Regions:
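N-terminal edge beta-strand
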Residues: 15-43
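Exposed beta-strand and adjacent loop surfaces of beta-rich binding modules
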Residues: 18, 46, 57, 102
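A mature extracytoplasmic/lumenal domain signature
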Residues: 25, 45, 51-54, 64, ...
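Bulky hydrophobic/aromatic "packing anchor" residues in well-ordered structure
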Residues: 21-23, 60, 105
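Residue-level preference for alpha-helix termini and adjacent loops
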Residues: 10, 31-33, 66
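Histidine- and aromatic-enriched segments that form or immediately flank copper-ligand environments
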Residues: 52-75
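Extracellular/periplasmic metallocenter environments
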Residues: 1-12, 73-108
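Beta-strand cores of secreted/periplasmic/IMS beta-sandwich domains, seen most often
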Residues: 36-54, 78-83, 89
Length: 108
């Protein structure tokens, strides 16, 4: 998570059926972060990204292209992904990627 100034270690959410990540949290010189930036989950966990309406339009795009949300600015919008296989999934916001708007899901 280079260039991601709100990264504060991996938040352990193993055992949870659903985990919420805020889109547009304060980071990287504005509302250009995911909070938490890195989470650890169990296989079968659904991650729900929820937009807070700050920092203009954001999206959630997997580095390997397996999922991509639409570009949205509205507060309360959600995008979900269920992780069925173990591994590390890196994702980012397309317009703010170079600013450090990136995240990681570690699936165990």
């Amino acid at each position: 998570l280079s260039n991601t100034n709100n990264y504060d270690g991996v938040v352990d959410e193993t055992g949870a059926a659903e985990v919420t990540v805020t889109v547009g949290s304060e980071a990287n010189g504005g509302n250009f972060g995911f909070d938490p930036a890195a989470i650890r989950v169990s296989t079968g966990t659904t991650v729900v990204w929820e937009w807070n309406g700050l920092g203009s339009s954001h999206n959630v795009v997997d580095e390997d292209g397996s999922f991509e949300s639409e570009l949205v600015a509205e507060e309360g919008h959600t995008f979900s992904q269920t992780f069925e296989e173990s591994g590390t999934v890196e994702y980012y916001c397309t317009p703010h990627r170079t600013m450090g708007m990136k995240g990681v899901v570690v699936v165990e």
